[in-house]
């Protein structure tokens, strides 16, 4: 990974709004990637500031401003939003384009991820969850990332796409590099590698259509009047590929780290496993507190927002974790309250680009809790093994060593 690009301060950026902040940086003393964001607030950072790091970008810190950027796609565009700027950059469908263009693919995908559609995936998610836990439950130890969280949502995603599960580790490595790399040249090369894999996949899938997302996209392409092109099919799959192989894994890692260190929370959740309403409320709170994604937008046109001059093509960073801990919106924002009744968190976004996979993500985490806690009720972090963390567009852990007393 190369040193992040540092850009000179543009003329429209006032000096008092400039802060030297690198969203990718992990210093030796950092133990939790959330802490680097909280430190911005603790140190009195302006609610809207500009950093010269990673090609230069704005960062919004307040809930209302982040919500506005989600809602207002006329000003804050999803199109060509990469940090650092990477060329060439794919026109990702549907999240990489704005209305009305994005509707074509979103309307194709929405029916696949409704609550009713996702409920039909329950049996498969549970089967996979049990199979993974069976492999290590009697060992008394596991690397939660390598043995469980890195395999459950990613394996399920590849199953839904109709991809070869024998190549799971290869796919994970490609998506992981995409999310972590700062060097735009290396990222462009990685994008090319992913497109190569997807091109090969679709050449095979053309002759082996099935009941999966990839086949649905190909059938849409071949439907007269759909307007769906081969390139758009691959662009859409690229987005699903990089989005589907990381965020739920990272969210699970933070949740299980919390459960490993706070027995009272373990017991409280264990008491809710067969109570859907209470479990659902607990899940919303877990997703609020552990929002792992840092979202990007690109300013579409020159505008003055809350007294700040934003220029067309400026990049904007939206840290969901700070929106979800804004005391102007949430009572006791730093506290994990599994009974919280009012919870308008932004973990899954808002507006036309709200996360398509939110119901599947909740199902996977709920099922993991339901299967894990009855079998491995008391577990802890193995402090003898160092834990490596990462920051960037998705925050998380490269490993999470856990131990428990195995049953005799």
Language-model segments: what does each one mean?
Residues 1-408:
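Cytochrome P450
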């Amino acid at each position: 990974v190369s040193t992040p690009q540092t850009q000179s301060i543009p003329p429209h950026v006032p000096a008092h709004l400039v802060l030297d902040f690198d969203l990718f940086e992990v210093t030796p003393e950092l133990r939790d990637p959330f802490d680097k964001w909280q430190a911005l607030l603790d140190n009195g950072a302006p609610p809207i500031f500009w950093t010269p790091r990673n090609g230069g970008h704005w960062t919004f810190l307040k809930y209302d401003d982040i919500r506005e950027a989600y809602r207002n796609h006329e000003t804050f565009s999803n199109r060509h939003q990469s940090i650092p700027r990477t060329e060439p950059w794919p026109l990702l469908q549907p999240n990489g384009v704005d209305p009305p263009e994005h509707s074509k693919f979103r309307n194709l995908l929405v029916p696949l991820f409704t609550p009713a559609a996702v409920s039909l995936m329950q049996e498969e998610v549970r089967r996979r969850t049990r199979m993974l836990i069976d492999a290590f439950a009697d060992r008394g130890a596991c690397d939660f990332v390598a043995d469980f969280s890195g395999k459950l949502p990613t394996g399920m995603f590849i199953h839904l796409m109709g991809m070869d599960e024998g190549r799971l580790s290869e796919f994970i490595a490609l998506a992981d590099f995409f999310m972590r790399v700062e060097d735009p040249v290396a990222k462009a090369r990685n994008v090319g590698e992913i497109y190569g894999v997807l091109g090969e996949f679709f050449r095979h899938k053309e002759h082996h259509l099935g009941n999966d997302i990839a086949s649905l996209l190909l059938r849409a392409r071949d439907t007269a009047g759909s307007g769906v092109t081969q390139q758009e099919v691959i662009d859409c799959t690229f987005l699903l590929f990089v989005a589907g192989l990381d965020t739920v894994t990272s969210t699970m890692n933070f949740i299980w780290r919390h459960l490993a260190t706070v027995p009272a929370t373990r017991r409280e959740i264990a008491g809710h496993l067969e109570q859907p309403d209470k479990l659902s409320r607990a899940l919303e709170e877990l997703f609020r507190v552990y929002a792992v994604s840092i979202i990007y937008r690109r300013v579409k046109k020159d505008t003055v927002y809350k007294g700040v001059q934003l220029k067309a093509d400026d990049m904007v960073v939206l840290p969901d974790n700070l929106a979800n801990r804004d005391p102007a919106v949430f009572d006791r924002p730093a506290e994990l309250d599994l009974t919280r009744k009012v919870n308008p968190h932004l973990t899954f976004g808002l507006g036309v680009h709200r996360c398509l996979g939110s119901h599947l993500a909740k199902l996977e985490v709920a099922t993991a809790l339901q299967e894990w806690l009855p079998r491995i009720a008391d577990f802890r972090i193995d402090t003898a093994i160092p834990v490596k963390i990462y920051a960037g567009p998705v925050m998380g852990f490269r490993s999470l060593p856990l131990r428990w007393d195995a049953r005799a």
